[in-house]
């Protein structure tokens, strides 16, 4: 715990030396024990020249104290002069004893700071005092316990001589043990029943037959001896020769096998349906890609794609004719005849394209008037091919150079 107080001192021509030692100034010999628990510190903060100081009078303050090695140190601390520097800030910590001296000048010089007191040792003294009290309380508790034990021994001595009380105690203990034993037996029975139910559920789930093939469900396995009697394994490990050992167990096994077979059949059928759906989606994607390419390519490329489309349809017919998968109708067929890849709309457009031919100047005029102007070379080439049915790379490159030089790409 620390406390701080204001401190001030004045040095002048009448009093040039001031000694600060609170440990020796304010305490008597009787208070030595109290002083050991207090530490004093002095923190200098400011020095100010008084109003009565003389002009051109230099004032120098020296400090005398003891350093860490126990040696006396004398050091100039500050210098003040009227009209030049009349005050100065300080940040110096000192421990007693300290002596301040006006070594030069007539002053007056006013020193100010903080006097701090550290009371940490008082807390330790309080802890020691609390420990002493706790020790005394502990001794009292021990004495009370000893007295209580002596009283109990005195009470037990007459009880030992009375057999009736002993018999009653034994009977009461036996009754308690019996009640606890019955409760334990009931708990064990409940635990066993729960374990049996869990085992039955696990066996019902785990009794799955081997994975069947796609052709059909697995069949029951049975061994036949030479005499014609069938043998099959029973869950308890025994073998039955033509007769059922336990009808209830056989019925449960048959039900489990049926459930397992039905689940396996459902899994097999669902797997086939998923495969069929995936194949149909792939075929639809292929057809959409083929139709998109027909609109962008020229006449020769459209003919090639028509031939490829016919090849794809032939492959689909071969896949549909396989015995494993059910027959499906190929898309694009009506009444057994395949539709051509090109739609009537595309065929009409094709006829219109063949009728009209474009010259280089016509193409340039159309490009200038066209509202949609591609900015990249690849898009420009595709645009020219689809609009003017131009397949000559030289003319396309010439158009691109003109198109780029006219700065139509920036519009």
Swiss-Prot record:
Signal peptide: none annotated. GO terms for biological process: cell division; chromatin remodeling. Phosphorylated by CaM-kinase II in vitro. Disulfide bonds: none annotated. GO terms for molecular function: chromatin binding; histone binding; RNA binding. Residues 134-156, 183-201, 246-321 have a biased composition (Acidic residues). It comes from Lytechinus pictus (Painted sea urchin). This is Mitotic apparatus protein p62. One of its GO terms (cellular component) is nucleoplasm.
């Amino acid at each position: 715990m620390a406390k701080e107080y204001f401190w001030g001192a004045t040095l002048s021509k009448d009093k040039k030396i001031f000694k600060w030692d609170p440990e020796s100034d304010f305490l008597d010999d009787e208070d030595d024990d109290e002083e050991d628990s207090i530490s004093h510190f002095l923190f200098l903060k400011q020095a100010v020249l008084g109003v009565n100081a003389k002009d051109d009078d230099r004032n120098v303050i020296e400090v005398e104290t003891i350093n860490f090695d126990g040696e006396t140190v004398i050091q100039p601390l500050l210098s003040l002069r009227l009209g030049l520097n009349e005050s100065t800030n300080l940040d110096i910590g000192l421990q007693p004893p300290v002596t301040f001296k006006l070594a030069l000048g007539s002053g007056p010089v006013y020193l100010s700071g903080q006097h701090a007191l550290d009371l940490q040792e008082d807390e330790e003294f309080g802890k020691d005092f609390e420990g002493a009290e706790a020790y005394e309380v502990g001794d009292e508790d021990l004495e009370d316990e000893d007295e209580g034990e002596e009283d109990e021994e005195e009470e037990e001595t007459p009880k030992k001589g009375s057999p009736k009380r002993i018999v009653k105690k034994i009977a009461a203990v036996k009754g308690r043990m019996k009640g606890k034993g019955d409760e334990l037996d009931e708990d064990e029975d409940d635990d066993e029943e729960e374990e049996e139910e869990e085992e039955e559920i696990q066996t019902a789930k785990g009794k799955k037959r081997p994975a069947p093939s796609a052709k059909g469900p697995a069949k029951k396995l049975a061994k036949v001896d030479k005499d014609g009697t069938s043998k099959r394994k029973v869950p308890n490990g025994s073998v039955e020769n033509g007769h059922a050992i336990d009808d209830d167990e056989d019925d449960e096994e048959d039900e489990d096998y049926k459930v397992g077979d039905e689940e396996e059949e459902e899994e097999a059928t669902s797997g086939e349906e998923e495969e069929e759906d995936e194949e149909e989606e792939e075929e639809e994607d292929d057809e959409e890609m083929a139709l998109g390419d027909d609109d962008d390519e020229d006449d020769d490329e459209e003919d090639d794609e028509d031939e490829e489309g016919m090849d794809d349809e032939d492959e689909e017919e071969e896949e549909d004719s396989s015995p494993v998968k059910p027959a499906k109708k190929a898309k694009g067929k009506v009444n057994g005849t395949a539709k051509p890849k090109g739609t009537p709309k595309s065929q009409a457009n094709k006829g219109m394209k063949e009728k009209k031919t474009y010259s280089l100047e016509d193409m340039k005029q159309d490009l200038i008037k066209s509202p949609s102007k591609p900015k990249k070379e690849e898009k420009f080439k595709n645009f020219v091919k689809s609009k003017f049915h131009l397949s000559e790379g030289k003319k396309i490159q010439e158009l691109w150079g003109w198109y780029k030089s006219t700065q139509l790409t920036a519009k």
